[in-house]
Amino acid sequence: MSRKWVEKEGPRWVEKEIITREQYEQIVGLYDDGKHAIGILPLLGSVLLGLGILSFVAANWQDIPQLLRLSMIIVIMTAFYTGGEWFLRKGQDKLGIALTALGLVSFGGGIVLVGQMFHLVAYDITSFTVWGLAGTLLTYMYRSRFLYLISLLIFTVAQWYSTEQFHQYSYAALAIMAIGLGYFTWQRQNTLLTWCFSLSFVLQCMMLIVDKDWAFLWFFIPVMALYTAGDWIKDRSTGYALQTVPLIAAYIFAIVMVLMWDERTSSLDKLLAMPAAYIGGLVLLLAVSVAGKLKQQRGSSAFEWILLAPFVYLSAGIEVLYLLALFFFSFYVLWRGYIEQWRFKINFGTLLFICSTMVAYGKLTWDFMDKSLFFILGGLLLLTLSWFLNRRKKQILADAKGGEH
């Protein structure tokens, strides 16, 4: 909730006598944008200071004696951690967390620099995993979102580095990230953290499939397991944040199947998983998902699984079925957004419907229509749909607000 939103909705609460004018002013006073902006400054300053120190040390590293290098690493890291703890005890949380984050960055930089000093050869990302584990422990110690995001970034980048540099996937890094940071996400029920965790998990699942050269459909088993976990979260916003990235991944896959699938040239070996195991896994996840939805009284959201229908195993009509799935899913999101009067879901559904329409337009007209005419008509169609859907959204939301009076 932001100050701007409170200032917009507050007068209506006063008008309905839900709160008094004095209470409204007190609530607005709790959301001081100036204090929030000032609180961000130490975090930004810590990032700039860390980059400056790393740049300076890297530029002069070879000229510094080895013993002094090691001493510098220990002193800088200790100073940041000590300073962070001192400021936290003084009640200056933002500055304390910023210095602690610099200590974490210094720890990771120290691992790399010590390896260079003693010419240590790495064959995996164990050192990065230790760095991420340290960040996870600090996250629990200080209950900090900033440290959480840094730790999540460390694990994600480390996994990418492992697959690119060493051509191997680190199950240890994934397990520590999923269990350690996943449990913290479950505890905090914070929308931003949940979004970021979901994105990192999906990206690492993609890296796993690519590194192991498995059939691509296996990607959706762990991804939809994450989606299923979201059905057991009571808070709607947090559950939706956990599920949105898996749904986006399934939506993009459906778009690819519509636009690029060709039975004559497509390689099924790179795409299709073993039917019995894959479909059985999806059915099991679907059952657990529906059970969670029914428990949370969100049974209608089971329709979201239409994007996971295994149309790709059919012998014909694959593009048409995936295109229909795109439209049905878009209509469903719009419909739920209007029923729940949830502006984010309405906007998201509007975007999905426009994307689905443009995918259908491109699929049906690209091969035979003049390209200039294709883009002109496509632009006009896009503008018309955008205008109509936004107008419809405003009308429905206005009617809903009018009905509350």
What are these regions (language model features)?
Residues M1-H405:
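Alpha-helical multi-pass membrane segments and their bilayer interfacial helix-loop junctions
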